[in-house]
């Protein structure tokens, strides 16, 4: 007898609803650039799937926490630039610059 159980809960992501919600925000704030936050696996909704659904929808950036997440956005084929919200290690700075990504600065050294 197996001691594993199938998942009892899951999320089904409606990509049309994601795009609709983005457009609602855009209508409310027409003069602002929008960043779709996809850090932490798009808050459990699947980073790659959300990126693919929203890429091309005129988001200014995809907000990620780390360089590793920025790589996942790139590897998903996104044209939209990742914006790294978390602190970066010194060894990651060159990769950020080479890829043309944006990053928040958390210290003067960065």
Where are these regions (language model features)?
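Active-site-proximal beta-alpha core segment in soluble small-molecule metabolic enzymes
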Residues: 2-5, 9-13, 17-20, 30-110
